[in-house]
A protein has these predicted regions:
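Short alpha-helix-to-loop micro-motif enriched in aromatics/charged/Gly
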Residues: 61-68
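Polybasic "coupling" helices that flank or enter modular domains
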Residues: 97-98, 115-180
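Cyclic-nucleotide recognition modules
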Residues: 69-125
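Short phosphate-coordinating micro-motif centered on Lys-Gly-acidic
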Residues: 36-41
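Cyclic nucleotide-binding regulatory module and flanking cytosolic helices
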Residues: 1-31, 71, 76, 81-85
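Phosphate-/nucleic-acid-contacting segments
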Residues: 147, 156-219
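Glycine- and acidic-residue-biased ligand/ion/polar-headgroup-sensing regions
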Residues: 33, 44-57, 72-74
């Protein structure tokens, strides 16, 4: 499918707006591990995922990563164009978790269209509200939810995303998602293994008892 089939506001644009987007649209194919947007140093533009998977995260003062949210097929990201919205001061990094095909609407192009089009402006505000709701939910998880519950939730989310109970993932990767240390995650996973919830092997975690993980995350 083409860009217009993915962009939810295409039919709300006039002919001139459609042309300026088409003339300036950037298509990128990025490999897993590619940094697409790097904090306030970049004003990349609005991202629209055609296929693949992106991860949006922040860095603590100590250099620890924590995932804010992920982007999948047909998802849009505005934080990569936060320079066009003065009230947003959010230093996020966006990385490809898998090989990804995406489109980029340059920030200034999107800013001009947002000024002209009420539907685009309204949609932008709704999308930003949704993303900040995601971030507030994450803060609540970090503040009030114990690490064992957060690890259980993450493992269950991964099995849903990947469609398998055999996860090819490192302890370091989990630590980066959850804003923790690798050693802490390793101890927690070994505890899970002792309890019969998972089986650990090099670069892989096999989920053995998803029901008990679900019970743990809800407790």
């Amino acid at each position: 499918m083409n860009f217009e089939n993915y962009f939810p506001l295409w039919n709300d644009l006039n002919i001139a707006q459609k042309k300026i987007i088409s003339d300036n649209l950037i298509t990128r194919d990025v490999k897993k591990g590619t940094i697409i947007h790097n904090g306030n140093l970049d004003c990349t533009g609005l991202l629209l995922v055609k296929s693949g998977q992106l991860r949006t995260y922040i860095l603590s003062d100590e250099g620890r990563e924590i995932t804010l949210y992920r982007l999948f097929d047909m998802d849009m990201c505005l934080l990569s164009a936060s320079c066009i919205i003065r009230s947003i001061q959010f230093e996020v990094t966006i990385e490809a978790e898998k090989d990804t095909d995406l489109w980029i609407i340059p920030a200034e192009i999107y800013k001009d269209i947002m000024k002209e089009s009420a539907p685009v402006a309204n949609y932008t505000n709704e999308l930003m509200a949704t993303r900040f709701s995601d971030v507030m939910w994450l803060i609540e998880q970090i503040m009030w939810k114990s690490l064992d519950k957060r690890v259980a939730s993450f493992l269950l989310e991964e099995t849903s995303i990947e469609g398998t109970n055999e996860l090819k993932i490192t302890h370091e990767t989990i630590a980066n998602h959850l804003g923790s240390h690798r050693e802490v995650i390793t101890r927690m996973l070994r505890y899970f293994q002792d309890e019969g919830l998972v089986k650990l092997s090099r670069g892989k975690i096999t989920i053995l008892d998803s029901k008990r993980l679900e019970t743990l995350q809800r407790s």
